[in-house]
């Protein structure tokens, strides 16, 4: 399963740096110039993987504990 990167707004659980999930109160920001994505303070929501509205990837249960 492929998980998408995250941007601000909405939910506070998102995938960051491959399989690392940003927890409560954090969001994932995309790295630039070859830098890795980072978890920072703020909420995040998954980006859709396709062009269909609302087509978001789910976060596995094991990450939500």
From Swiss-Prot:
Keyword entries, A-Z: Disulfide bond, Glycoprotein, Protease inhibitor, Secreted, Serine protease inhibitor, Sulfation
Residues recorded with modification Sulfotyrosine: 63
Pfam families xref list: Hirudin (PF00713)
Recorded GO MF terms: serine-type endopeptidase inhibitor activity
Disulfide bonds: 6-14, 16-28, 22-39
Highest taxon in the source lineage: Eukaryota
Disordered: region residues: 39-65
Biased composition, class Acidic residues, residue ranges: 55-65
InterPro entries: Hirudin (IPR024793), Hirudin/antistatin (IPR011061), Prot_inh_hirudin (IPR000429)
SUPFAM superfamilies associated with the record: Leech antihemostatic proteins
One Gene Ontology term, aspect cellular component: extracellular region
Subcellular location: Secreted
Region (Interaction with thrombin active site): 1-3
Ranges for region Interaction with fibrinogen-binding exosite of thrombin: 55-65
Glycosylated residues in this chain: 45
Function: Hirudin is a potent thrombin-specific protease inhibitor. It forms a stable non-covalent complex with alpha-thrombin, thereby abolishing its ability to cleave fibrinogen.
Family designation: Belongs to the protease inhibitor I14 (hirudin) family.
Name of the featured protein: Hirudin-3A
